[in-house]
Amino acid sequence: MVTYFEDRAIYLFNICCYDMKQWRLFFTIQWTITTLQLMRFLSNAYIQYNWTSDVAEVFMQIADFVTEIPFASAFTAYIISASICLGCIAFAVFTALSHHFYQWVVPIILMRYILFWFPVIYFPLVIPHLKMILSCFSYTIESYTIHPFYENVTCWSGAHGGYFGLSIVVATILCVSQYLIISCFYDSEMPSGTSLAAHSYVARYTALSDSMMFVMKTILLILYIGGHTPSWRYAMGFLTFLSGLAAAAHLLYTMPHWHDTALLLYTFQALLLSWTGVTAVLMTALDDTEGTGMLYFVMLPVLLIAAQMAMQWRIRVVGELSARELTNGTLIITKIRYYARVYFQWLAQFGDIYIEESEAQTRELMSCFALVEDTLEAGLRRFPDNTDLHIYTTQFFRRQSQPRARLSFAESGRERSEPNS
């Protein structure tokens, strides 16, 4: 049964991945929204931190707007969330069936946009159901306690049991769908071409870091909602700090994004999550919400600089790794990423202009190809079971044949144009 649903999901992703490129504006919007959703862990929405800083209050109001369904009461948001979730599942089934039997294209186009934006709306959809599931475990059946988040529901009453069951189903569907989308539906194309502006921001060779971040965010969200009392502030602060630190370390180790800007922003996002945990601990220990709140936002540029320095340090370390130090498939690909980055930096010196093929450009490209081929050959020989390495190898040799074919054509053209001696 599990394999059947996995096959259907892969089929849906395959028909929707005809174009995985994403506008940089959309990438920036999505990154900003998900960052605000992480910052909201420090708001009063889950655990009371009682902000007194005006700047913090404004930011948290914006974070509230993008993290939960706005302009709706708690119970209305619950109904909207369940309806959207079930509607998306029904539309996905309709898309797959209409394409399979009638080759309809329009549903695929719409489904592609839903898959792109689903990671952004995951928090607003799942939070109402986690609130329904988790918030009554602190109370007994005999207490007849009003639900902490839904005033018209009594904990462990018959109505609560029905909503509880529905929320279990919807939350499970949302979590599994989000995990599959993050793990399978992403731009895995390696960068190519001399136009650096055309390189995708979101391209990456693996989704392991994104999947890890998703799992940690979901666990933190469950704990924040389940432990919504002030006594949890220290524990949740430490857990948030460790989660962000682990996410940043994993990003820097794997370096999954081909574009430095994307890697920098996601590393900054992970450090911000870690700093959110530190601020929660300081706010609780010092009992100073105004001063600590200002410190939280003052440190944001420092975190960005720290992310940039950490990324540059990691790039330098990877560049200095010898062949015997490449002890796993991930390090093999990070080494290849370093070679590609060196070549694209060489191209960057000419600016964002059209570059004619020249002997210098051909020499640099062939040098990069040679280094990548040698590294791939050694990697496949030492780590034959690494999936990401096999996927990249297939893409590399498919892409490599295109510039080499153009070079051969150009050389033959030059030979024909030369006078006979």
What do these predicted ranges mean?
Residues 197-203, 207, 365, 394, ...:
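Solvent-exposed, well-ordered amphipathic alpha-helical segments
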Residues 249-263:
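Alpha-helical transmembrane segments
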Residues 298-384, 388, 392, 398-421:
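N-terminal alpha-helical interaction modules that lie
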Residues 113, 195, 248, 359-360, ...:
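General secondary-structure edge motif
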Residues 1-245, 260, 264-267, 271-306, ...:
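Extramembranous, membrane-proximal N-terminal regions and early juxtamembrane loops
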Residues 113-120, 357-360, 395:
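Short interface patches used for recognition in eukaryotic signaling and trafficking proteins
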Residues 120, 142, 202, 255, ...:
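A general structural-boundary detector
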